[in-house]
Amino acid sequence: MEISSHQSHLLQQLNEQRRQDVFCDCSILVEGKVFKAHRNVLFASSGYFKMLLSQNSKETSQPTTATFQAFSPDTFTVILDFVYSGKLSLTGQNVIEVMSAASFLQMTDVISVCKTFIKSSLDISEKEKDRYFSLSDKDANSNGIERSSFYSSGWQDESSSPRSHLSPDQGTGIISGKSWSKYNYHPASQRNTQQPLTKHEQRKDSIKKAKHLRLSQPSEMTHYKSSKREARTSDSSSHASQSEEQAQMNAEMDSTPVSYQYGQGSDVTSRSFPDDLPRMRFKCPYCTHVVKRKADLKRHLRCHTGERPYPCQACGKRFSRLDHLSSHFRTIHQACKLICRKCKRHVTGLTGQVVQEGTRRYRLCNECLAEVGIDSLPIDLEAEQHLMSPSDGDKDSRWHMGEDENRSYVEIVEDGSADLVIQQVDDSEEEEEKEIKPNIR
């Protein structure tokens, strides 16, 4: 028979003992603040403490003291309370620090909870942004209707001039008279008798999209404004020659300058600025960094979470970005650095010499040459010159770097117990060809 309350009761008793410093045999010093705890509890809850206490398992009679500088006392308080109570107090301000400390202490459960907390915070922020964008779209549409009705009152006076020759029933917008008949902006007597055209309703969404694009580009709006004014003064008699689509677009382009022409207050004028339109931006919930794509936000969050998903296949070092891994592999593992065959130290043309034994050629540093004896080993000066700077006649030799800049390959030459790795890297035209790296396995 299992009693479910026994585990929680046991944790409560251990936590009470910790608070009263009863049977505490371990002291943790974090930036000058001392925390009392029990070694068996720390051993069971943290992989780092398990490794640390296993080394001192023979000295159980002496109290253990551990010192940490990787995190703050407040962060360790949250983790220690979780160990003794099972409750993790996470906030938007401490989740990154707690996750970093849990990663240091090798507490996988805490790391998983922190990742879930961060993901839920991002989901909430995304929902809030979607709600803001939907409200902004509604406000933009309502503002557009108000502007259109306001502008129609101003254009009615101008459309009453003798220049408007077409009747509203024809459904064709006039450039000079600025007739708004195709938008159904008519007086009350005409609205009851005139029916909207199907083609105009179909193009309503496309006109709104063009209007939003125009508002996001003020320079193009100014260009259309000046061009329309010139067309209005130079060609006042070209009415019926314009097509219906051109008249509709031109009427929309003229709607924004009206707010400046009539000057009916800052409310109407301010609504025409592109700042009121929604913009797709992703803001980091832990700093002020703002990006345009969600993928960039995920990559930025790695600097807060400490996640490094890209390991180096050669040395095991992990990186947070793929380009950093590529740069590391090129500069560290693919660099043609000359090493001594005996001591494996880096040598240059001054600190080492090329030695030839039969058909094998390798490089030794001056110290190793002194230990082995320079007289007992033949020094191949010609081979050293070829290794340092290959000449034109040695292009077919396997001891120099190829000049094909479009390829990168590794040629392995097996000779006895030594392997010579000849590697080509992409160099600029101004750089000299690098020396060969003998890699002794």
Swiss-Prot record:
There is a cross-link at K178, K182, K199, K437 (Glycyl lysine isopeptide (Lys-Gly) (interchain with G-Cter in SUMO2)). Residues 234-248 have a biased composition (Low complexity). Residues 146-170, 178-197 have a biased composition (Polar residues). A zinc finger (C2H2-type) spans 282-304, 310-333. The modification Phosphoserine is found at S161, S167. Its main location: nucleus. GO terms for biological process: regulation of transcription by RNA polymerase II. InterPro entries: BTB/POZ_dom, SKP1/BTB/POZ_sf, Znf_C2H2_sf, Znf_C2H2_type, ZnFinger_BTB_dom_contain. It comes from the Eukaryota. It is found in: Nucleus. Residues 146-252 are annotated as: Disordered. Residues 198-208 have a biased composition (Basic and acidic residues). GO terms for molecular function: DNA-binding transcription factor activity, RNA polymerase II-specific; RNA polymerase II cis-regulatory region sequence-specific DNA binding; zinc ion binding. GO terms for cellular component: nucleus. Residues 24-92 form the BTB domain. It holds the Pfam family zf-C2H2. Keywords: DNA-binding, Isopeptide bond, Metal-binding, Nucleus, Phosphoprotein, Repeat, Transcription, Transcription regulation, Ubl conjugation, Zinc, Zinc-finger. May be involved in transcriptional regulation. This is Zinc finger and BTB domain-containing protein 8A. It comes from Bos taurus (Bovine).
